[in-house]
Amino acid sequence: DFGKRIFLNSMKISNFSKISTNIFGSRVTGFIRDILFANYLGANLMSDAFLFAFRLPNLFRRIFAEGSMNSVFIPLFVNQEKINSKIANDFIWIIFNFFFGITLFLSFLIFLFSEQVISLLAPGFLLNESQFLFANDLLIITFPFLIFVTLSSVLSSVLNVKGKFFLPSFLSVILNIFMIVSLIIFKSESHFALAWSMIVAGFTQLILLFINIGAIKIFWSTGLKSITELSGQLKKFFKRFLYSLMGSGIVQ
């Protein structure tokens, strides 16, 4: 028992040090990114257009992913894991596929109605046609980042429950690195380079998470074979998700 306690304590210290290191890395790379933002983008109308296109998918990320993952998905997943781990794995993928569908649909709507969205949320851009069109082009590129970051939140939550803390805490570092590299390499097209770097970073994050999830023997499926057994859990999830969505939406 004494040896087991020492082992568990050492694991906690190791996980804490990994998370702390990644948080520090995120702060440092974020600081460097912001310096390069100021240097290459400056403070002008086009930079305002990029910041709008950058912030909108992140706003939806906070509404969809952050609150619902911590307060809704994780407790239900942990509970199902205790009952039946195989069915719990199907629960993961049902929720994963649900978020994929809803974020893909939202991205499609933004693609179709991006001009109307900008007119509604940033009416000041209407005063300058070039800024408005620039923001429109950037938003069409950046908004699908919501798909990757939301799906990454689902898989990160699973890894955290399984005690795998390194990659989930490293994801923001990956995004910052891609944005930094894009700014350095594509100086003349910095705004569009940053927009595309978000998509490439999001895709990279998701691939790495899939690899890590696969390493603990959790593989993608439709999850539909367990839909009957999970009906109660799914009802709870969607009910709580709706409440979380309304609460997060009001706050944002």
Where are the predicted features?
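Membrane-embedded alpha-helical bundles of multi-pass transporters/translocases
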Residues: 7-252
